[in-house]
Amino acid sequence: MIEMRLSDLAQQLNAKLHGDENIIITGVASINNAQVGHITFLKDQRFLSQLSSCRASAVILSKNNLIFCKIAALVVEDPYIAYVKIARLMDTTPKPSKNIASGAIIASDAILGQRVGIGANAVIESEVILGDDVIIGPGSFVGKKTRIGTGTRLWANVTIYHEVEIGECCLIQSGAIIGSDGFGYINDHGVWIKIPHLGTVKIGNNVEIGACTTIDRGTLDDTKIENGVIIDNQCQIAHNVIIGARTAIAGGVIMAGSLTIGRDCMIGGASVINGHINICDKVTITGMGMVIKAITQPGIYSSGIPVQLNTVWWKTAALIMRISNMNKRIKTIEEKLKKLLFL
């Protein structure tokens, strides 16, 4: 358990403290479930009604909401960001070992930096280069000639194929697979012939990749993930895709091959994006968006029909199926009106 005085947390956040500065904080919790010893946060007015019954020892809030607070408080400009900073300070996620497990298999010509940790049953193949403070989780595989930069961590059972390049301070969650062959085939008189994937995957610095996400290597050119990209769980990123810096991709997104996504984009969960198109910088695609052509202007884009009662949805679907015929009828009426107007 981590314990911190409220005054120390206030100093870390540069927050104004109201109440007992000697309160000991032992954890962070939501406003509904917080107990004695916890610090919570009031994100916005929607949760104000829950503040009076909150059992936390302290709360993070904005100046405007201080008058409603009967417990110790840290007053900040943005309570949510402050909560995240405190959560990072009090994170109890186990620290990885910086030892090399006896069961790890490491090629004799692999180059390991200082303070490298390699878990049990991990495999490090020939000519791999691991920077300082790299952590390779148990059961992970790092293929031949792969390079991993300083401070990057692979959780358990991550697979990195040959000749992949991963930058500094990246975090790759369990089950991720990076550098596997893409879906590249050509049909020769009824027989599918596999296209060799001669490119690789190049990942920048400060990139986070979620559990069970797959990133395919390029066919000729490389698949590229630029600095600061964050990718959620169970995403599929096909061969030759390029993702611009600081783009955020939610869970279950599917990206077809040779797609280029700009910088500072946000892709909502379960979206599907066609290949061989470009999406410009600062584009947001809402959840379950289907993108079939290039996007050249920044903005928020949506597609699909939001959930409805089943009976209503069937009526909507029936109307959609009739749109083509309705359009033809409207055009016919317009033509008749034009003739009448010019008589």
UniProtKB/Swiss-Prot annotation:
The protein's enzyme class: transferase
EC number: 2.3.1.191
Listed GO CC annotations: membrane
Pathway terms, separated by semicolons: Glycolipid biosynthesis; lipid IV(A) biosynthesis; lipid IV(A) from (3R)-3-hydroxytetradecanoyl-[acyl-carrier-protein] and UDP-N-acetyl-alpha-D-glucosamine: step 3/6
The reaction(s) this protein catalyses: a UDP-3-O-[(3R)-3-hydroxyacyl]-alpha-D-glucosamine + a (3R)-hydroxyacyl-[ACP] = a UDP-2-N,3-O-bis[(3R)-3-hydroxyacyl]-alpha-D-glucosamine + holo-[ACP] + H(+); UDP-3-O-[(3R)-3-hydroxytetradecanoyl]-alpha-D-glucosamine + (3R)-hydroxytetradecanoyl-[ACP] = UDP-2-N,3-O-bis[(3R)-3-hydroxytetradecanoyl]-alpha-D-glucosamine + holo-[ACP] + H(+)
Protein's GO biological process: lipid A biosynthetic process
A Pfam match: Hexapep
Catalytic residues, chain numbering: 239
Coiled coil spans: none
Alphabetically ordered keywords of this record: Acyltransferase, Lipid A biosynthesis, Lipid biosynthesis, Lipid metabolism, Repeat, Transferase
InterPro entries given in the database record: Hexapep, Hexapep_transf_CS, LpxD, Trimer_LpxA-like_sf, UDP_GlcNAc_AcTrfase_non-rep
GO terms of molecular function: N-acyltransferase activity; UDP-3-O-(R-3-hydroxymyristoyl)-glucosamine N-acyltransferase activity
Its biological purpose: Catalyzes the N-acylation of UDP-3-O-(hydroxytetradecanoyl)glucosamine using 3-hydroxytetradecanoyl-ACP as the acyl donor. Is involved in the biosynthesis of lipid A, a phosphorylated glycolipid that anchors the lipopolysaccharide to the outer membrane of the cell.
Quaternary assembly: Homotrimer.
Protein family (similarity comment): Belongs to the transferase hexapeptide repeat family. LpxD subfamily.
Protein name as it appears in the record: UDP-3-O-(3-hydroxymyristoyl)glucosamine N-acyltransferase
Species name: Blochmanniella pennsylvanica (strain BPEN)
Organism lineage string: Bacteria, Pseudomonadati, Pseudomonadota, Gammaproteobacteria, Enterobacterales
Gene from which the chain derives: lpxD
